[in-house]
UniProtKB/Swiss-Prot annotation:
Any single biological process term in GO: translation
SMART domains: KOW
Species, as recorded: Photorhabdus laumondii subsp. laumondii (strain DSM 15139 / CIP 105565 / TT01) (Photorhabdus luminescens subsp. laumondii)
Pfam family, one: ribosomal_L24
Keyword Ribonucleoprotein recorded: yes
Description of how the protein assembles with itself and partners: Part of the 50S ribosomal subunit.
UniProt name for this protein: Large ribosomal subunit protein uL24
Length: 104
């Protein structure tokens, strides 16, 4: 099955502490989760790695969110939208269901 949310898509968070925030998808995990820039920030205690010249300390980084808790953002309507698939010129493309515009 094709992925409805892909890397570099702009998404909006539907539920949780970051509800309503928008961000760009950095990574889509095979476990049904996505990592979104600036969303679901957690503090991680990191040990120093002298070989890589990395200092230790408390680092803020993005944690994964369930893909069902985000929706693709439609810039034309300014709202969250659903994704559909159709074939054009023998290629499968994604489109917004609200206004039938192709995605990228």
């Amino acid at each position: 099955m094709a992925a409805k949310i892909r890397r570099d898509d702009e998404v909006i968070v539907l539920t949780g502490k970051d509800k309503g925030k928008r961000g760009k998808v950095k990574q889509v995990l095979s476990t049904g989760k996505v990592i979104v820039e600036g969303i679901n920030l957690v503090k991680k205690h990191q040990k120093p790695v002298p070989a890589l010249n990395q200092p230790g300390g408390i680092v803020e980084k993005e944690a994964a969110i369930q893909v069902s808790n985000v929706a693709i953002f439609n810039a034309a309507t300014g709202k969250a939208d659903r994704v559909g698939f159709r074939f054009e010129d023998g290629k499968k493309i994604r489109f917004f269901k609200s206004n039938s515009e192709t995605i990228k």
